Swiss-Prot record:
SMART domains: AAA, ClpB_D2-small, zf-C4_ClpX. ATP-dependent specificity component of the Clp protease. It directs the protease to specific substrates. Can perform chaperone functions in the absence of ClpP. This is ATP-dependent Clp protease ATP-binding subunit ClpX. One of its GO terms (biological process) is cell division. It comes from Cupriavidus metallidurans (strain ATCC 43123 / DSM 2839 / NBRC 102507 / CH34) (Ralstonia metallidurans).
């Protein structure tokens, strides 16, 4: 380093960048045959700061454009899931806030944003799993479905809760970074409810014990996962997966929860202002949106787990009109799928409105919701799909109400010929 003062006999040194002599600046730093003054260093630092700031702004703008807004998330859900408008809105906001939080994790800030996991409550076949699957596909993140009924505490026969993270890793080719931003959907969460309000002296390895094990996973922990799906043994190197930023969505039918809610509301609704309404008159779909944490505790979930699932969305039971829409409107609607299957044989499929209504009514009677629609349609088309490759000249297959009820076979329309019934010679 060359100081400002120097003897006249010494050779005068100059900054290699601005050309100022050592007498014109405070400091002159020497490198291998190169010199730089303090003023040029300050200027370089200023340029670097400005460029870094511009890069951060561009990254923030890119983040906003990459992440779909709640309205866009809702519109995407509408393409695949019919009805459940309030649940879609709640999910869209929760998922948007979660991934917006992840985008800003690296920034230093006084306010630390906590994770908001989601609890979906609704009857079988109302769209809980489909909503979670559609969200993961939209956001292009790893996704896994786990069945809570197969889980047990560590050390007991059954699946360990850490197996969920192992499956998530498998779905993204063991890329830990990707897995740590994925979505885990835990189905049948209501089936691991505590068997009674009072703690039992016997070990509940598939109830409260599993809830306690899930608690750490959902809250955020370092899960040890064997590489490439191997079994755990002491002398093995494990993959460490941080679950802090994994979004957990838990779903369940919670059969009987409406009774717990009605008992609570009956106690609070006393006096002249109380609305007199019999339990039979109150639909489950009307009661479930009134769910409070105390109801879930009474049902059998532990308070700590409920606290880790702050976003609660309830799904309504699907009526006949909604089930008919599900058959024909979504992008991957069942009718469209079977029309495509028959189109591969060069045959058109027509399902009349009366048949759609009959399918919906049958699903409601079976209490299977949207999940039961496929089996009803498959059963009605089974004989046609079996015989169709052997038939020649079939132009169209027509399904009417009598086909669904089993009173008549599907109608086959031949090219320039009179219609015939399937299976007749």
């Amino acid at each position: 380093m060359a100081d400002k003062k120097g003897s006249s006999s010494e050779k005068l040194l100059y900054c290699s960048f601005c050309g100022k002599s050592q007498h014109e600046v405070k400091k002159l730093i020497a490198g291998p045959s190169v010199f730089i003054c303090d003023e040029c260093i300050d200027l370089c630092n200023e340029i670097i700061r400005d460029e870094a700031s511009a890069t951060d702004k561009d990254a923030t703008a890119a983040t906003r454009s990459d992440l779909p807004t709640p309205h866009e998330i809702r519109e995407s859900l509408d393409q695949y899931v019919i009805g459940q408008d309030q649940a879609k809105k709640i999910l869209a906001v929760a998922v948007y806030n979660h991934y917006k939080r992840l985008k800003h994790l690296g920034k230093k800030d006084d306010v630390e944003l906590s994770k908001s996991n989601i609890l979906l409550i609704g009857p079988t076949g109302s769209g809980k799993t489909l909503l979670a699957q559609t969200l993961a596909r939209l956001l292009n993140v790893p996704f896994v479905i786990a069945d809570a009924t197969t889980l047990t505490e560590a050390g007991y026969v059954g699946e360990d809760v850490e197996n969920i993270i192992q499956k998530l890793l498998q779905n993204c080719n063991y890329e830990v970074e990707k897995a740590q931003r994925g979505i885990v959907y835990i189905d049948e969460i209501d089936k691991i409810s505590r068997k009674s309000d009072n703690p039992s002296i016997t070990r509940d390895v598939s109830g409260e014990g599993v809830q306690q094990a899930l608690l750490k996973l959902i809250e955020g922990t370092m899960a040890s996962v064997p590489p490439q799906g191997g079994r755990k043994h002491p002398n093995q190197d494990f993959l460490q997966v941080d679950t802090t930023n994994i979004l957990f969505i838990c779903g369940g039918a919670f059969d009987g929860l409406e009774k717990v809610i009605m008992q609570r509301s009956d106690k609070t609704g006393i006096g002249f202002a109380a609305q007199v309404q019999s339990k039979e008159e109150r639909e489950v779909s009307e009661v479930l949106p009134q769910t409070e944490p105390e109801d879930l505790i009474k049902f059998g979930l532990i308070p700590e787990l409920i606290g880790r699932l702050p976003v609660v969305a309830t799904l309504a039971k699907l009526d006949e009109a909604a089930l008919m829409q599900i058959l024909i409107e979504p992008k991957n609607a069942l009718v469209k799928q079977y029309q495509k299957l028959l189109a591969m044989e060069g045959v058109e499929l027509e399902i009349r409105p009366a048949a759609l209504s009959a399918i919906a009514r049958k699903a409601i009677r079976r209490k299977t919701g949207a999940r039961g629609l496929r089996s009803i349609l498959e059963q009605s088309l089974m004989d046609v799909m079996y015989d169709l490759p052997n038939y020649k000249g079939v132009q169209k297959v027509v399904i009417d109400e009598n086909t669904i009820t089993g009173d008549a076979a599907p109608l086959l329309v031949y090219e320039e010929q009179q219609p015939k019934v399937a299976g007749s010679n």
